[in-house]
Amino acid sequence: MKNLVVITCITFAAALTVQLAAAKDPDISKLPPAAKKEGLVFDKDIKPLIENSCLKCHGAEKPKSKYRVDSHEAFIKGGESEEAAVVPGKSEKSPVIHYVADLVEDMEMPPTDKRDKYPKMTAEQIGILRAWIDQGAK
């Protein structure tokens, strides 16, 4: 009986490790390409994108997962995971890109069950967000 418990625990731990590794390394080959736009800035180019899809849940009042998107600094900083949401210069490593591109299971943004109210970003919009991040997220 003890052997069965040990084997079950080891199997569970191995499965969990595989799941966590997959969450940390999303398949970036599925990302839309970065837009070929130069000089993108947060207030003019990015804020309108996130206001439409993200602000209702991640605004100043009771932001989900303590992640606010209502300012440049907050958008980059991230939330309760204490991991930066944006890695300036590296959109492919930025968690916010993984979430809006639906690369992380159960972390799709906006959540799939809320997309009737809050639309998913289009591939073109994700490309603009990627270009802004790749240009330094200024």
What is each residue range found by the language model?
Residues M1-V5:
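Positively charged n-region of N-terminal signal peptides that target proteins for export
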Residues Q19-K138:
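Aromatic- and Gly/Pro-enriched helix-to-coil junctions and flexible linker segments
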Residues I7-T17:
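Bacterial N-terminal signal peptides
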